[in-house]
Amino acid sequence: MATSSITIPTIRTPIHRSKFLGQTHQFSTVNRSVFPPPKQQSKLYQVKAMGKFNLWEVMGGRGLCNGEKGIEKELQRNIEDEQETSKAENNETERESDDSNLSFKVPEDGFEKEMMGLTGGFPGGEKGLKTFIEKNPPPPPPPPPAKQGSDASAVATDKKPKAPKLPLLMPGMIAIVKNQNSPYHMYCGIVQRITDGKAGVLFEGGNWDRLITFRLEELERREKGPPGKNPKSCILEPLIEQMQKEEAAP
């Protein structure tokens, strides 16, 4: 039997091609470069250095413009002519300012400083103040009280008012316990705080420090400070005074 060979035509179409809308796109990145193409720089704006570099002009020479050339110009300049021209210009400006001041008049009833752009002042300035005082003079001082009867009433009126009394106790003051029924009788301490009719007193005695509250009636203000060693030593003060009096007596 004769063998028959059947040849199948091969379809040679690209695999990685897309025929969407009749366009073919290559998805292979073999021939594509990673970096974008360089942009061409526009040559429209180019800066050109037109000035010259002169060290003496940059540094200023001896403090004048253009260095040595500036000094020569200053030496050749005529100062008298410039002074005359400047004086003439100043006179013209003064005349113009005087004319403007004469044209600008402030009424006496108006606020001068407010009209000129400032604040405050009296209406009409000093003239307005004088006219106001003339029209509204200050009231005369009250006459002294006539003396009636004895001089006691006059002395009473001449006395100065008394200064207000200080409160009984304030924080920082020194107080002593005057309640004989209290175990802290004649103890002396420093007032720390006062609330609701009571005061907290700090007794300092070396290692013995204690803060105790008392009623205001139980305490009395004291000028002399508390003893440094023992707060109970205040009890001995009257005894020491009595002993000193007995020793001083013959």
Swiss-Prot record:
Subcellular location: Plastid, Chloroplast thylakoid membrane
Transit peptide: 1-48
Keyword presence, Glycosyltransferase: no
GO biological process, one term: photosynthetic electron transport chain
A family per Pfam: NdhS
Catalytic reaction(s) noted: a plastoquinone + NADH + (n+1) H(+)(in) = a plastoquinol + NAD(+) + n H(+)(out); a plastoquinone + NADPH + (n+1) H(+)(in) = a plastoquinol + NADP(+) + n H(+)(out)
Covalent crosslink: Glycyl lysine isopeptide (Lys-Gly) (interchain with G-Cter in ubiquitin): 52
Alphabetic keyword roster: Chloroplast, Isopeptide bond, Membrane, NAD, NADP, Plastid, Plastoquinone, Quinone, Thylakoid, Transit peptide, Translocase, Transport, Ubl conjugation
UniProt biased composition (Basic and acidic residues): 76-94, 106-115
Regions of compositional bias (Pro residues) in chain numbering: 136-146
Post-translational modification comment from the UniProt entry: Arg-193 is the critical site for the high affinity binding of NDH to ferredoxin.
Enzyme Commission identifier(s): 7.1.1.-
Region (Disordered): 76-163, 222-250
GO molecular function: quinone binding
Membrane topology: Peripheral membrane protein
UniProt-listed InterPro entries: NdhS
Deleted gene: phenotype: Malfunction of the NDH complex.
Class of the enzyme per the UniProt entry, highest EC level: translocase
Gene Ontology annotations for the cellular component aspect, listed alphabetically: chloroplast; chloroplast thylakoid; chloroplast thylakoid membrane; cytosol; NAD(P)H dehydrogenase complex (plastoquinone)
Quaternary structure note: Part of the chloroplast NDH complex, composed of a mixture of chloroplast and nucleus encoded subunits. Component of the electron donor-binding subcomplex, at least composed of NDHS, NDHT and NDHU. Interacts with the NDH subcomplex A via the protein NDHT and NDHU.
Described function: NDH shuttles electrons from NAD(P)H:plastoquinone, via FMN and iron-sulfur (Fe-S) centers, to quinones in the photosynthetic chain and possibly in a chloroplast respiratory chain. The immediate electron acceptor for the enzyme in this species is believed to be plastoquinone. Couples the redox reaction to proton translocation, and thus conserves the redox energy in a proton gradient. Required for the efficient operation of ferredoxin-dependent plastoquinone reduction. Forms the electron donor-binding subcomplex in association with the NDHT and NDHU subunits.
Name by which UniProt lists this protein: NAD(P)H-quinone oxidoreductase subunit S, chloroplastic
Species the sequence originates in: Arabidopsis thaliana (Mouse-ear cress)
